[in-house]
């Protein structure tokens, strides 16, 4: 069985409150900027080698109610061939995305996955 590793971990700054720095940014914009940063930090990673973008969404409503996983994949990677999926396990959504990516890599169904957690956008 293959091993799965977390190679990079990033977090956007806190600032979605009514007066916060990111109050006018949508979750998909913040996430796509995070993916772009990751790709720039790991130049040996060809973004077309990413097999899946798995997004945990604790509250799928308003701006993040659509298939935000696919939207983030398209916006962040600018590659149409990388799929995206949205997972809702409420407070465990982020943990579930890591478990899914790890299971896919260990079973040989994927080589590289990107996971992301989105939180409520309204304070």
Language-model region placement:
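Conserved active-site "lid/cap" helical segment
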Residues: 1-73
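Structural alpha/beta core scaffold segments of enzyme domains
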Residues: 44-49, 104-107, 113
């Amino acid at each position: 069985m293959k091993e799965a590793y977390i190679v990079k971990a990033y977090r956007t700054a806190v600032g979605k409150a009514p007066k916060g720095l990111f109050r006018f940014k949508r979750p998909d914009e913040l996430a796509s900027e995070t993916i772009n940063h990751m790709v720039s930090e790991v130049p040996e990673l060809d973004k077309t080698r990413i097999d899946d973008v798995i997004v945990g969404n604790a509250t799928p409503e308003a701006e993040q109610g659509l298939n935000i996983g696919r939207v983030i994949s398209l916006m962040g990677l600018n590659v149409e061939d990388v799929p995206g999926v949205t997972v809702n396990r409420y407070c465990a959504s982020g943990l579930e995305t890591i478990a899914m990516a790890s299971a896919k890599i260990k079973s040989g169904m994927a080589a590289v996955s990107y996971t992301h957690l989105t939180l409520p956008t309204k304070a």
